[in-house]
Amino acid sequence: MYPSTLPAEADPSTMNGSSVAEPPDFQAATAAAAAAARASSLEQDEWSVGECGFLDPDVQRTMRSGSAAEDITQYPMHGWVDVTKEFHDACAELQPGELAQDMLFGLFEAMSAIEIMDPKMDVGMGFDKQDLPPPSFEAAIATGAIKLDDLTPSELIGIYDALFSCLVSWLEGNSMDQVLFTCLYLHAPAQIKDKALRVFCTAVRNLIVVIKKIIAVAAVNEEEDFQLYGNSALLAAEKAQPATVYSSLKDVEDELIRKCKKLTSTEDWMAVVHRLRFMRHLFQVIYHVEQMASNDTVDDKVDIYKILLVASEMLPGIRNTLDRGTQPEKGSDAPNPMGFSPRIHDRSQPPAFPRSIKIRDRPSSYQFLEEMISRFKYACKVTKYKDYYSALNFFIEYSKKSGQCILSRSVLQTLFSANMRMAHGKLPMKQFLRHSVQVFNSPPVLNAKHPVAADPKVQQHLENFFRYCINMNTFTQFIRICGFNRARQRDKLARLIENFDTIQVDAARLDSMMNQLANERAMEGNEPMATALKHSTHFSTWVLYNCFRAMLIFLMSGFELELYAVHEFLYIYWYPYEFLIGFLVSALTRTENILLAQEEYAEHQSKTQSGGSGAAKNRKAAKPKKNKKTQRPYRAEIVFYHALLSLCGGMYKAMGALTKDGRVRLPLSKFDNEEIRYNRRFLPFATLTSPPPVSYAEFKNVREHMMRHSVEDLYTYAAKHFDQARNVLESIQNPDQEMLDLLQIARTNFVVMNVLARGHQKEVKRQPEFDFSKHSYFPIIKLK
């Protein structure tokens, strides 16, 4: 049934002079009503009822007769028409999977229509007309559905476990009202007489407030991660006092322990104590993290790590006593038989929450909490990383391990920098970046002991550069982006890469000024200062390295998110093989060479100074150090990038061979424009001056040159690349799990390419399977 809108014949005197603002696209009937409202000399019969042909004929006759005029109390008036037959006839013209689209029926309306009356999406489908309204807290007390005092250990354990399950379901992105506040005890904990239950429910309410604050301050959540807002009135009923929760939980624990000493069988009560103790430690950790946003000390982080160790040790014992609590009833949505009303807030939810919620089961909820605590412990290690290079590496690695847990990602952001202007809570970000450049490639101008550091002109240029870096927020935003979920990271990296161009220009300008100052000091006869400033590319190298990393993460994340079609793999692997990884290796190699040159210059200066002093002649000559280790801090990373370079080369040549061999399904030419797809994939790189954008014509020329080789040669070339990657990875000492996975991929693909080069399955042109289960960026090629 569709409503039809009719402009009622209203008195012109009441409508004259009224202002009606209309959007550019609106219904014809509404347009007629708006025109009637704006016209000052409009006759009543100018808009005839007959023009509104979609109205039911009976309604039209009634309107013409004027008998309904006295009954009109609302403007406009709706006449309902049964369009079921017409609707079914129109739908018969659509093929399965097709959607109708109209100016008034777009994708939003289509998705709403699909979800309506689907039991998995439409929460209203779970109701029957005979269902009684879900009981409120007061109604449940009146009917005796819940107990407020003298709860047994089994009942307490069941409620505790159910609340932990609801907490985990909330952290997974579900509505707070539909999971946590289905527990009636959370609505008014002050009315609960049982102290163990009252204190636990109060702790949960305060935990909700603290978690919401941490996530809001960290600001790395999106709508699919976490529902930050809920029914605030439920939380406002009792004022949150997080500072008193810890002592209250400890008092209840002590009382129950004293009670256990008087009992013969204590297993059930000790299971209650363990859950209270775990809640106390969990709350203490999260509350400390929230407080560190304003008062950050290293001691707090050490305390947090110790508390996390205790909490993680308690979880195995709790999981072993899950069967001691009351269990959910079969066929019921409630996580516990007593104290929960799953549908209490369904009718009060806004349209944004139409779906039915399935609360996690208890074993998997405690598994989630155990993994979350492990991530918290890992996040505490961020305090060891005092420069941007190592901190960024840690954030990238943590992003891969944190998964979809928004609280874990928010805790890391808070531990590192709750304020974007401060690193580790107390170090100004400008000073942090300055120290990071010094650690990365040690520019002499940043060395306080070097004479060039006293030059006011040099310091002014440095101050302007780092102030510009802070104002642009590019480097701080790069770290913050690593806190978002993996899908959102790619979208935000695309915008971040565009910002690097202006900083690259500023860094190049700074290096140029340093070289200019070097020439001026040389003309003045100040050779030491001129040598320190000459050929300075420190700042450009640092900026370019971080830009290249952002580009590589952006490009390769498309494989993890399954955004690329198989026929696109060719140019996706080609770009890092031909350009990006080579740029990264070049930047790191140049940095190492700078460090080596500075080391040699320092040794030369030391020998010159010691050789000229008389005291040095009387001392015994120092023995030369054997096998002196030179500064090569980036050697391991360079070797790893060489392995990635060979893997990208192998995949690029393999995709070329498979395409030429007819084993890759290509889109139909009339539906395909490869140039458009290519430009869209590399669109964020188009604004950069370094590296310069690579046009589709350049890629096409390179591909045509490669495709001149025979299929067998291309398979052989791909096998050689995979073999090179295997050799590089096998040479790495103490490889981590990622390197071992890449080694297995290189070995397997090497064998597959050799098999295809010898003509295996030459007559069967099936597209191979690309298995990304081992690694997100590089697949194992499997022949079918």
Curated annotation (Swiss-Prot):
Protein name: N-alpha-acetyltransferase 35, NatC auxiliary subunit homolog
Biased composition (Basic residues): 617-630
Alphabetical list of PANTHER family matching this protein: GLUCOSE REPRESSIBLE PROTEIN MAK10, N-ALPHA-ACETYLTRANSFERASE 35, NATC AUXILIARY SUBUNIT
Gene Ontology CC annotations of this record: cytoplasm; NatC complex
Keyword terms, alphabetized: Cytoplasm
Self-association and partners: Component of the N-terminal acetyltransferase C (NatC) complex, which is composed of Naa35, Sbat/Naa38 and Naa30A.
Positions of region (Disordered): 1-23, 320-353, 606-630
Pfam families found in the cross-reference section: Mak10
Source species, domain of life: Eukaryota
Taxonomic lineage: Eukaryota, Metazoa, Ecdysozoa, Arthropoda, Hexapoda
Function: Auxillary component of the N-terminal acetyltransferase C (NatC) complex which catalyzes acetylation of N-terminal methionine residues.
